[in-house]
Structures are given as structure tokens and as C-alpha cells.
């Protein structure tokens, strides 16, 4: 898998290698086929072109009156819609897809169409003079419809990481309702609960005990 000069071509060479495996030009062990297929599936998902025209509305209720206030709560609502305007324009002006696809395209790219809603609640309250308890809950769901069968990768949810389910690296947890073999797990619904007890140790050194509960799921979405 080298070019005319004998140099390795990582990108093209990878695809030629996978193509030879799937065409059975190269023989591999059956247990190795699934991970190799996962590489190709992951690449196609992450690099897929998406044309997104969206509008959103966010409403936040925050009881915090001072920057260093320890007892406060915040409730955030967000709704977002994408693709409805483009769908109306293509229907009004009778834009014809000449490529034989069942999906409408603009500039040669299928436009995304989905509805998304999120609610996020945070509560901090003091326990004693320097200790505090922090709670956070999050629910988000994005449903594709019309011109889309799945949510664009950039608009999907993932679990894990330093501010999420901290027992897993980012994108390594879930989906809860899928047999995904991908390293970058993502889905269109997420539920998370976090509870953290923060306390002083010595001077400016602080400590925390926490528990994280949550996962991601594929709901009305054909992503695997």
C-alpha cells in the first residue's frame, strides 16, 4: 500500500487494505473482521457531510445573585429545530434531486432535519462553612425526521469524560440500546445524574467525593 514513489499512504492505504479484506483478496481471521469493519464504520460516521440550518431557543432560570454564592440553583431549557425551513423552500420551489437519491440536497449535500430538546438542572447548597453538595441532572433527546434518518454526529450526545460519567473516557460509554462496536460511541438521547460532595483538605487544597449515573441511547434513530 504505497504510492508510485514507494512511500506509505496511510489514508488511501487503509481503505485499500480494508477493501482487499472485504473482497477476500487478503485472508484474515474471522475474529479480526469485526474490528476492521468498525474502523470503516467509524470513519464514515465521523466524516459524513451534513448541511445544518438550525434555530434554537434557550431559557435559563438562575437564583445566583453573587459570583461566589454557595447556595443557588439553575434550570435551563433548550429547544432546537433544523431543516424545516429548507424543506419548505425545496417544496415551494420544487427543487428536484437529479442524483436518484430519496433525500433532498443543497449544494450536493443532504440537509439535516431534526427536533431537539434539553433540560438541565443544577443545585448547589452549603454543608457547614466550607463544604458543599452539588447536584446536576440532564436530559436531552434529538429526533430525526423528514430528510434525515439519524442525527448529525456534531449534534449527537456522548457519555464519559471529566465533566460527565467520570469512570469512562469521553465517547467510551454506551449506547445503552445498541450493539455498537465503535470507539466513538454516540447516540440521540442522554440521561445523566451527578452528585458531588466537596470539602476542604488543607489550605487551598480541596477534595471531592462523587457519584455519576447515566448513559446514552438510540431512540428513533438508525445509527448503529
In which residue ranges do the predicted regions lie?
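C-terminal transmembrane beta-barrel domains of outer membrane proteins
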Residues: 1-2, 9-10, 41, 54, ...
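Phosphate/ATP-binding catalytic cores across multiple sugar-kinase/actin-like superfamilies
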Residues: 58, 62, 196-197
Amino acid at each position: 500500500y504505497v504510492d508510485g514513489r514507494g512511500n506509505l499512504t496511510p489514508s488511501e492505504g487503509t481503505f485499500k487494505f480494508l477493501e482487499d479484506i472485504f473482497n477476500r483478496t487478503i485472508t484474515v481471521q474471522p475474529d479480526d473482521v469485526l474490528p476492521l469493519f468498525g474502523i470503516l464504520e467509524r470513519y464514515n460516521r465521523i466524516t459524513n457531510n451534513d448541511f445544518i440550518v438550525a434555530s434554537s431557543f434557550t431559557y435559563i432560570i438562575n437564583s445566583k445573585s453573587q459570583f461566589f454564592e454557595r447556595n443557588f440553583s439553575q434550570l435551563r431549557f433548550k429547544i432546537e429545530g433544523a431543516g424545516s425551513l429548507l424543506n419548505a423552500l425545496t417544496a415551494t420551489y420544487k427543487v428536484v434531486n437529479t442524483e436518484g437519491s430519496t433525500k433532498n440536497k443543497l449544494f450536493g449535500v443532504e440537509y439535516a432535519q431534526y427536533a431537539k430538546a434539553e433540560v438541565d438542572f443544577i443545585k448547589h447548597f452549603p454543608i457547614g462553612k466550607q463544604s458543599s453538595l452539588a447536584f446536576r441532572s440532564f436530559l436531552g433527546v434529538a429526533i430525526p425526521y423528514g430528510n434525515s434518518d439519524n442525527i448529525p454526529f456534531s449534534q449527537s450526545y456522548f457519555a464519559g469524560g471529566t465533566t460527565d460519567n467520570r469512570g469512562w473516557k469521553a465517547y467510551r460509554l454506551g449506547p445503552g440500546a445498541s450493539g455498537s462496536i465503535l470507539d466513538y460511541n454516540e447516540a440521540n438521547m442522554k440521561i445523566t445524574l451527578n452528585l458531588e460532595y466537596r470539602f476542604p483538605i488543607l489550605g487551598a487544597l480541596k477534595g471531592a467525593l462523587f457519584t455519576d449515573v447515566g448513559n446514552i441511547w438510540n431512540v428513533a434513530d438508525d445509527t448503529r
